[in-house]
Amino acid sequence: MRTRIFAILLLCSLLWPYSYMQPPWGYNQATRLDVLHAVFSEGTIAIDSFHENTGDKIEWNGHFYSEKAPGVVVIAAPAFAAVYAVLGALSIDSSSELGWKISEWFTTVFSVGLLAALSALFLFQLLKKYTSSRTALVSIFAVYLGTLIYTYAVMLFSHTATASLIIIALWAIDNGVGLLDSGKLSRRHSLLAGGCLGLTIACEYTSALSAGALLLFVLFKNRKHAMYLLCGSVLPLLLIPLNNWLISGSILSIPYEYVTDFPGMQKGLFGIEFAPNISVMWQLLGSQYRGLFFWSPFLLLCIPGFVFLWKKSTSAFWLMLITPIVSLVLISSYSYWHGGWALGPRHLASVLPFLCIPAALGCHRFKKAGIVFAALSILLTGLGTVLQPLAPEGKTKLLTDFYIPMVQSGEIRESLGSLLGLQSILSLLPLFVISAVLMRLTWKAIDTRTAA
């Protein structure tokens, strides 16, 4: 009973901030919503009736289609179906301004937002096994409210979905072949890991690197379970050729091949030129502009954490070290490494699961530093996410030149608080108060008797 109460409180602690602010408008989320509206209102994936609100599209044989991988749309479909039915029952046109706002808000929260919150339960169990219950919870709050996972859980992007699926896959692998120690050699867990990784790739093609690294890890530990993992990945991976076929009639024709509004995508392999850039790497890791460690200093604890990880498992050490490094090198040579209007290095989202485990190990060793860094991460990333997760591309000093002036001017976007009549900074009061109460209750609900 105590475990169930804890799980419910943890879910609420995350879903509340994920749902509080109205999702901001942008090409990335609009193109996926266009597909959902087209499928449910017109029975087609062609977005001809909606395409003018996005630049993330291609034109093929006189029709417009989303250029994005299909996975996020599939994940979001159940939530959209529910809100579409409710809007219909209330005689609200889903394509009207009000209908669009309601459907986007609800769909975002109960697709990528809910997936992220559920994955936190899996990560908690994984971290608790190798640290302690309290360290695991501090790490959960830091990762899910103080990193890119929070930022992209409030919009219909692919990044939080991919990170969440990889986290569930890591938990499943730990119960299959074992992550830091020997596993249970559970076939169903290896199949689950495969399903999550296949869906990860179907959400974001570049996450194939992280998925491939995990496949090699499982293959190294147990060939039979690597086959189970591959079998589990087949069904979700079929979403990719199905989407290609529905658009162009060819299962091998990826929509990115026909993107014209972003000329950088024509360079190299879909924009990746395999020319590592040290300056860009710094921007991706340490700068105000897109720095992963600047906005999420809790992840710096992965540095001492890797030392402890080496002592626990050399194979896991190399997995969690090399995967982020290779991803960093590749993204540094990507034409759009900055991610356009964004907060943080969104193209590195798929490496977060590989950093949060060693960061939790570091937090377990340096508990006071862990709490301080977790609080700082939540403050910085939370500030940016609440104010404007789609920060202007041209602002290089986001904190000092963009977010702090927004706070000083009281410029706050629409939220549940503003719908209740609260204005400016006061509109955030329910978010902060209820979040603090939920986090406190979650902390008190931990069953420390199961601590490692």
What is each of the regions a protein language model found here?
Residues 8-13, 143, 195-197, 234, ...:
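Transmembrane alpha-helix segments characteristic
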Residues 2-9, 88-98, 118-145, 163-164, ...:
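Transmembrane-helix signature of polytopic, membrane-embedded enzymes
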Residues 142, 161-181, 189-197, 354-358:
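Specific aromatic-rich, kink-prone transmembrane helix
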Residues 175-179, 209-242, 303-313, 357:
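Perimembrane helix-loop-helix junctions
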Residues 36, 139-140, 144, 150, ...:
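Membrane-interface alpha helices of multi-pass inner-membrane proteins
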Residues 215-219, 293-316, 355-361, 367-375, ...:
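Hydrophobic, aromatic-rich transmembrane alpha-helices
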Residues 48-61, 245-309, 392-432:
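Membrane-lumen/periplasm interface segments of multi-pass, membrane-embedded glycan/lipid transferases
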Residues 151-161, 291, 344:
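Short acidic/glycine- and proline-prone juxtamembrane loop motifs at membrane-interface regions
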